[in-house]
């Protein structure tokens, strides 16, 4: 008998060796990166689109990108299938008999052990039993007809894959080699497969494969680095029947059976093993469900269990309807409300049934999730918990106590709201990631790295905090539930959670499918009485509901708006808020005192309404701030004067949205100036450079804090850095103006350099003063010596440091050298900070001197005239202006530039 790859079949099992079986690969090529991707087994290639790209790859999580190499996706798919060693014995029962102890067909060597098979890139995971053909020839071949790679590429040597990818059976297997001629033949294999009613046929050594593929339970592969940590367990019965848990993959030498034979051999040990594995993967969830039903736990635990049920839905399979979820919740509610009021429960059930009869009012997917073309910065708010639109709405209630959001007397509305949100999220997107994240509700106030949005407006008066209406950044509501009107999503309408001092009017605050998570496009309309209302471009607000939603209705800090509201109805412990919904009231508990954030004194004078026009554009959103009620005009005038004098932090100064837009505009001007300079238009580029420098100064002033002692280190660092960089840009502009003999403009630019450096030194002064004192204490003056009265402290410090350093060099005593070691090493940071401070002061004074020289040169060189005199006078006014009020200085600089350029 001829040898096959160095393996000589023995007489005991030569007749029982099965013929090798070919499992065919299916590949698809990306039309963008032209990389081939191995398709899962059973994929119907006729269902693939004509234009296929890597982003459509959905069977390997996190690998649907063109930058992933071809080998990575192939190896990742192969890694999902593992080989299980079958039993050593093979029973003889005929040509089409599959022994129960054999899980996958294989080839055996002379000693009865399993021969080492070559690992294939398309190894199939299948737990069904395959028959061993007793009448097959005993010869065991490893020719290329055992495998047909669809891309006509050579396969790596078998010994490499044997040692690398089958470590479990290495000690039982014998490495086999493959000749170059045999590998060459594998290039000419066909990619097509033939299936006829489940019976696989072999035509001209073109082996086919079964088109039904067993799915992969992701619980089997938690150790794979490409598998997400949050593995989805699939409850769907159809999914369970269609997909099965398997622990072994079919080898190259396996002979595929027909689908009918697989169904008839359903009772083999491998199927039993798979069933046990499948049951084990669902054990935790079933036990958790049983424990919840038996122990009658609190309602929020029910929500956690239901959230787990939502996460286990197959997002790419059949979708559940709202009614099915409501039926499930109603069945579980029987345990939750055990011993409760049955009459109230019946009323709640009737309300839900009525809500089902009004599908036209059910919130649409856009009410909870922003469209793909817009930034998903909008948030839903519920009792100090933010949930971004990217998160599953069921997490809104995950970490909350059972009575923190809704009382147990009204559980069904909360259930339905969560179910409605989850169902909409499932139906509105074809693929939802299982990884979720919670957004911290406490945003850093005035953070310079905020997105293009407005920072939250807060009131430091805690006694009147419930009377002030606040709006949060990006058009959302602020995090503190005690001072907001928090809209909550329900299937048929929205119920606003009102703070103390406000009363719900009508059945709901907003109705219809208005996108609540974002402001949308808001129009300003001044109705009679100067009441500003918001047109949400959906079902509009009713006149009696406008004040409840108006974010600027209470600009007066004395609670002007809340005087017209009905007194708050207090619940138990005086901390519950009641919402009017027709004749029904929902009791809300909030724990306001514990969750209320502390507010700095610098925010006490923040105004809500302003006479200034500020525009915010983000996506399709646009908010216009207009004047508010005349009753608050006196207070607004005082607040605005405080802002101009720099006495208090204003919304404009702390507005992250304005800072971001100003910074973007300044950078755009600088880039445009660079392009003009590259084209040789130096005069035009200089004007744009200087205008960009002025805008950078404005951005740095917005990051300032009026009270340096209470300022945050992050804001101070941002402001100092911006001032230092802007000073260099202004210096560049000044030198450019001097080259063009525009001395008046150069004087203005030098003035900006002076202001920028003085501002930077101003914020460095506290640390510089401490550094000076620290260094002063280190370098003590020797007894009997007294410094000159005309010398400064820094001069004394330098002179003593140098003299002692020289004496240290001259002496040979190590003790003397050790005494001055702290000055050289330990205080290096103090020295560097002090030098940076002195450098800023020196550069500022140098810019002052140059600005005076430039204005003098401009006055002597230009012809006298009224326009010239006015321009020079305005420039002198700018030069005499102090550096504290940057905004006023920028206004004067622009005015002077207009006068000198006319």
UniProtKB/Swiss-Prot annotation:
Tissue spec. comment: Expressed in leaf sheaths, flag leaves, nodes, internodes and panicles.
Residues annotated as binding Zn(2+): 30, 33, 54, 66
Effect in UniProt of substituting residue 27 to A: Abolishes binding to histone H3K4me1/2/3
Protein name (database record): Cysteine-tryptophan domain-containing zinc finger protein 3
Residues in CW-type zinc fingers: 21-74
Annotated source species: Oryza sativa subsp. japonica (Rice)
Domain remarks: The CW-type zinc finger domain is not required for nuclear localization.
Gene assigned in the entry: CWZF3
Keyword Zinc-finger: yes
Keyword Zinc-finger among record annotations: yes
Region feature Disordered, mapped onto this chain: 131-233, 326-345, 420-480, 537-651
Listed Low complexity bias regions: 421-433
Compartment annotation: Nucleus
Bias-annotated ranges (Basic and acidic residues): 151-169, 193-203, 214-233, 335-345, 612-625
Principal subcellular localization: nucleus
Biased composition (Basic residues): 204-213
Keywords: Metal-binding, Nucleus, Transcription, Transcription regulation, Zinc, Zinc-finger
Molecular-function annotations in GO: zinc ion binding
Function: Binds to histones H3K4me1, H3K4me2 and H3K4me3 in GST pull-down assay. May facilitate the recruitment of effectors to mediate gene expression.
Top-level division of the source organism's lineage: Eukaryota
Ranges of compositional bias, category Polar residues: 450-463, 564-588, 599-611, 634-648
A GO CC term assigned to this protein in UniProt: nucleus
Signal peptide (UniProt feature, chain positions): none
């Amino acid at each position: 008998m001829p040898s096959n790859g160095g393996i000589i079949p023995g007489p005991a099992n030569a007749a029982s060796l099965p013929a090798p079986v070919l499992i065919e690969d299916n590949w698809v090529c990306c039309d963008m990166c032209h990389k081939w991707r191995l398709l899962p087994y059973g994929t119907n290639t006729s269902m693939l689109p004509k234009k296929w790209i890597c982003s459509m790859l959905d069977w390997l999580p996190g690998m649907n990108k063109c930058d992933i190499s071809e080998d990575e996706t192939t190896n990742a798919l192969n890694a999902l299938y593992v080989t299980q060693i079958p039993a050593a014995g093979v029973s003889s029962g005929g040509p089409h008999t599959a022994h129960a102890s054999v899980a996958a067909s294989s080839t055996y060597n002379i000693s009865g052990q399993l021969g080492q098979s070559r690992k294939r890139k398309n190894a199939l995971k299948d737990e069904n039993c395959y028959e061993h053909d007793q009448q097959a020839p005993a010869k065991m071949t490893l020719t290329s007809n055992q495998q047909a790679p669809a891309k006509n590429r050579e396969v790596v040597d078998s010994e490499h894959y044997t040692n690398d990818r089958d470590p479990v059976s290495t000690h039982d297997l014998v490495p086999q080699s493959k000749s170059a001629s045999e590998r060459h033949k594998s290039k000419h294999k066909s990619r097509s497969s033939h299936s006829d009613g489940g019976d696989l046929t072999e035509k001209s050594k073109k082996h086919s494969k079964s088109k039904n593929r067993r799915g992969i339970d992701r619980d089997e592969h938690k150790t794979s680095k490409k598998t997400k940590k949050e593995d989805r367990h699939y409850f769907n019965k159809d999914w369970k029947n269609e997909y099965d848990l398997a622990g072994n993959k079919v080898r190259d030498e396996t002979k595929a059976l027909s689908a009918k034979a697989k169904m008839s051999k359903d009772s083999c040990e491998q199927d039993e093993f798979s069933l046990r594995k499948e049951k084990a993967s669902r054990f935790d969830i079933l036990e958790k469900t049983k424990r919840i039903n038996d122990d009658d736990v609190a309602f929020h635990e029910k929500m956690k269990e239901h959230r787990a049920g939502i996460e286990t839905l197959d997002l790419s399979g059949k979708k559940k309807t709202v009614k099915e979820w409501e039926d499930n919740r109603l069945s579980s509610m029987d345990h939750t409300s055990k011993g409760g009021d049955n009459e109230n429960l019946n009323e709640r059930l009737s309300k839900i049934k009525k809500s089902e009869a009004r599908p036209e009012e059910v919130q649409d997917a856009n009410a909870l999730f922003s469209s793909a073309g817009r930034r998903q910065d909008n948030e839903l708010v519920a009792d100090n918990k933010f949930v971004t639109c990217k998160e599953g709405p069921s997490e809104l209630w995950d970490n909350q106590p059972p009575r923190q959001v809704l009382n147990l007397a009204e559980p069904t509305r909360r259930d339905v709201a969560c179910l409605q949100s989850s169902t909409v999220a499932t139906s509105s997107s074809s693929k939802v990631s299982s990884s979720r994240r919670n957004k911290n509700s406490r945003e850093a106030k005035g953070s310079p790295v905020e997105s293009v949005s407005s920072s939250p407006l807060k009131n430091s008066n805690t006694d009147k905090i419930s009377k002030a209406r606040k709006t949060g950044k990006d058009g959302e509501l602020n995090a503190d539930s005690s001072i907001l009107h928090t809209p909550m999503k329900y299937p048929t309408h929205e119920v606003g959670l009102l703070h103390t001092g406000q009363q719900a009017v009508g059945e709901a605050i907003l109705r219809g499918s208005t996108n609540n998570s974002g402001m949308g496009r808001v129009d300003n309309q001044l109705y009679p009485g100067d009441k500003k209302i918001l047109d949400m471009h959906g079902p509009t607000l009713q006149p009696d509901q406008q004040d409840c939603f108006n974010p600027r209705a209470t600009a007066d800090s004395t609670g002007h708006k809340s005087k017209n509201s009905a007194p708050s109805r207090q619940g138990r412990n005086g901390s519950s808020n009641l919402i009017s919904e027709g004749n029904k009231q929902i009791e809300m508990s909030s724990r306001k005192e514990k969750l209320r954030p502390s507010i700095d004194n610098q925010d006490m004078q923040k105004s809500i309404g302003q006479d200034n026009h500020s525009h915010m554009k983000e996506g399709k959103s646009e908010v216009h701030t207009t004047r508010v009620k005349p009753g608050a005009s006196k207070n607004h005038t005082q607040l605005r004067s405080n802002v101009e004098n720099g006495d208090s932090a204003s919304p404009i100064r702390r507005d992250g949205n304005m800072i971001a837009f100003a910074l973007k505009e300044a950078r755009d001007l600088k880039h445009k100036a660079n392009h003009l300079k590259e084209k040789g238009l130096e005069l035009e580029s200089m004007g744009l450079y200087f205008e960009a420098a002025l805008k950078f100064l404005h951005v740095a002033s917005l990051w300032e804090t009026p009270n340096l002692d209470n300022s945050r280190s992050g804001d101070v660092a941002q402001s100092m850095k911006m001032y230092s960089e802007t000073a260099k840009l202004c210096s560049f502009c000044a030198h450019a103006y001097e080259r063009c003999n525009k001395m008046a403009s150069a004087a203005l630019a030098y003035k900006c350099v002076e202001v920028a450096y003085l501002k930077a030194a101003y914020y460095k002064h506290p640390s510089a003063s401490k550094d000076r004192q620290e260094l002063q204490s280190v370098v003590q003056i020797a007894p009997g010596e007294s410094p000159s009265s005309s010398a400064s402290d820094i001069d004394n410090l330098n002179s003593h440091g140098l003299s002692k350093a020289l004496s240290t060099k001259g002496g040979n005593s190590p003790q003397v050298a050790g005494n001055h070691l702290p000055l050289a090493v330990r205080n290096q940071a103090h020295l560097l900070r002090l030098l940076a401070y002195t450098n800023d002061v020196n550069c500022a004074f140098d810019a002052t001197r140059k600005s005076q020289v430039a204005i003098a040169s401009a006055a002597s060189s230009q012809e006298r005239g009224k326009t010239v005199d006015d321009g020079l006078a305005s420039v002198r006014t700018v030069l005499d202006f102090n550096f504290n009020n940057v905004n006023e200085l920028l206004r004067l600089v622009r005015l002077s530039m207009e006068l000198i350029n006319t």
